[in-house]
From Swiss-Prot:
Main location: nucleus
Entry GO CC: chromatin; cytosol; mRNA cleavage and polyadenylation specificity factor complex; nucleus
Residue ranges of WD repeats: 72-109, 113-151, 156-192, 196-234, 238-278, 282-321, 350-388
InterPro entries to which the protein is assigned, alphabetical: G-protein_beta_WD-40_rep, Pfs2-like, WD40/YVTN_repeat-like_dom_sf, WD40_repeat_dom_sf, WD40_rpt
Name under which the protein is recorded: Polyadenylation factor subunit 2
UniProt entry tagged with the keyword Cytoplasm: no
Gene3D superfamilies registered for this protein in UniProt: YVTN repeat-like/Quinoprotein amine dehydrogenase
Gene, per the UniProt record: pfs2
Disordered: region residues: 385-409, 480-509
Length: 509
């Protein structure tokens, strides 16, 4: 049957996953007043039915492993697919903003992950974006050296030619009065946000500056460059305070610890490592390994000061817990990867959890939801993916293709399908119990019942003799009757030992 030209195609309905944090948050607000003391720890039971009792990550602040976002939720992609360079959650956590290589900003719903808005904001590729601390402004940099101001509705209000080459990173000051930009021209610039004027130009790197971050509460800048150096700057005078020489290749991103004192700086590099520097000692205290190729991005958990996540150029995602003893993490990693040679060290740390096949290509950007229950990643494979923490006793969360790989997951899926088909096509034989019960009424039957597995058991005396069962009170009952006739002999019952002709017991007369 031919379809009319203007007929509407009815698409097949599909289920859409959603991660609604409202129920857990409301339950936490109600029950937090019932805690015995402020040190009370809520522990979810390992049962899928306990998902209704799953509280926000803040309730499990003493156990950061309960909030490792390793469960795949959804993949979002535009109709015209392009490389995703930037992912940023809005300050209220209701939407996600992504910036692509074509200069487009896309807004995605934070609950159902569906498309909401697309805006052609830049003429060049979007390289960086950052929300102000109060959430009222968004600034972004592109491949043409432009910095643009946006309102929350993505209305462009100002354009600044900040650099002659690509703007690689931007960061706001703690009070939103200034911001800093890093560029491929080898310099950093400090700007007055309200006046849009340049205040300082920081030079000292010998090559492209790939990243910059402003300390959440101090007048301190950290930058990373293609010259393998990490530098700290004073934004008031423009002088270089210190230089760190830990990495052996290009620094891809530097990020200060959010909140909780912000005493640490995490940096990732193309030397396949992530280093955590202590600002008080000005040296690295942890070296995070586990990536086989370049590490492109890093993000701190918004609620746990000791949990951070990295994304690699091979599409892998690694979660690290800084509280875990290094030797213990090395032992666990060696059990998973016995072919990898490890060097025991007091500061080498390996992943607490891994997603080896999170994306098909390199990951350029990642960020946690403000509540900490979701992780978003943007990749060179032109997709944006959402990850959440595992549910109680969720054994299937690590059995998908993102953890096992395409080939192994397909093999496991084919095995499951074969097992289901075998169960559907199963035709049971004649029930042996029916034949056994039929033989039980056979007078010639002797021995035990013919049950499966008991055929070789020795025979026992049969309860049947000459077709009559030897049961007290039923000596004259036959198997053909449904009910046994009462015996004509006197039954010995206390108080009824003898009976008169009129039917009354003699001892009651």
């Amino acid at each position: 049957m031919e379809r009319a030209e203007n007929a509407r195609i009815i698409q097949k309905p599909m289920t859409r996953r959603t991660v609604d944090y409202g129920s857990g948050l409301s339950k936490y607000i109600v029950n937090r007043h019932l805690r015995s003391n402020r040190y009370h720890i809520h522990v979810p039971r390992p049962n899928p039915n306990q998902i209704i009792n799953l509280y926000p990550p803040y309730e499990y602040k003493y156990n950061n492993t309960s909030s490792l976002c390793t469960k795949y939720i959804h993949t979002s992609a535009n109709k015209a697919r392009h490389v995703i360079n930037v992912v940023r959650w809005t300050p209220d956590g209701r939407r996600l903003l992504t910036g692509s290589s074509t200069g487009e900003f896309t807004l995605w719903n934070g609950l159902t992950f569906n498309f909401e808005l697309i805006n052609q904001s830049h003429d060049y590729a979007v390289r960086c974006a950052e929300w102000s601390t109060d959430g009222r402004w968004l600034i972004s940099g592109d491949g043409g050296g432009m910095v643009k101001y946006f309102e929350p509705n993505l209305n462009n209000v100002k354009i600044v030619q900040a650099h002659e080459m690509e703007v690689r990173d931007v960061a706001f000051s703690p009070n939103d009065s200034k911001f800093v930009t890093a560029s491929d021209d080898g310099s950093l610039k400090v700007w007055n946000f309200h006046m849009s004027t340049e205040e300082l130009k920081l030079t000292g790197h010998g090559w492209d500056v790939k990243t910059v971050d402003w300390h959440p509460s101090k007048g301190l800048l950290a930058s990373g460059s293609k010259d393998n150096l990490v530098k700290f700057w004073d934004p008031r005078t423009g002088t270089c305070i210190a230089t760190l020489h830990g990495h052996k290749n290009t620094i891809m991103q530097a990020s200060f610890q959010k909140n909780f004192g912000s005493n640490y700086l995490a940096t990732v590099s193309r030397d396949s490592t992530c280093r955590v520097f202590d600002l008080r000692a000005m040296k690295d205290v942890r070296v995070l390994r586990g990536h086989e190729k370049d590490v492109n991005c890093v993000t701190w958990h918004p609620l746990y000061p000791n949990l951070l996540t990295t994304g690699g150029s091979d599409g892998s995602v690694n979660h690290y817990s800084l509280d875990e003893p290094p030797l213990l993490s090395q032992q666990k990693y060696h059990e998973k990867h016995p072919n990898v040679t490890l060097s025991a060290s007091s500061y080498l740390l390996y992943p607490t959890a891994e997603i080896p096949f999170a994306h098909d290509l390199g990951i350029w950007s990642m960020q946690y939801h403000p509540l900490g229950h979701l992780l978003c990643t943007g990749s060179n494979d032109k997709t944006t993916r959402f990850w959440s923490r595992s549910r109680p006793d969720d054994k299937e969360s690590t059995m998908d293709r993102h953890h096992l790989g395409e080939e192994q997951s397909e093999a496991m899926l084919s095995q499951r399908k074969a097992a289901i088909e075998e169960d559907d096509n199963y035709e049971p034989d004649e029930n042996p119990l029916t034949e056994t019960l039929a033989n039980a009424h056979n007078p010639q039957f002797s021995g035990v019942l013919n049950l499966p597995g008991l055929g070789t058991m020795p025979s026992f005396p049969s309860p049947y003799q000459h077709g009559q069962p030897q049961i007290p009170g039923m000596l004259h009952a036959s198997l053909s009757n449904s009910y046994a006739e009462p015996s004509t002999q006197n039954s010995f019952i206390p108080g009824l030992t003898s009976k008169s002709q009129d039917g009354y017991p003699q001892n009651y007369r």
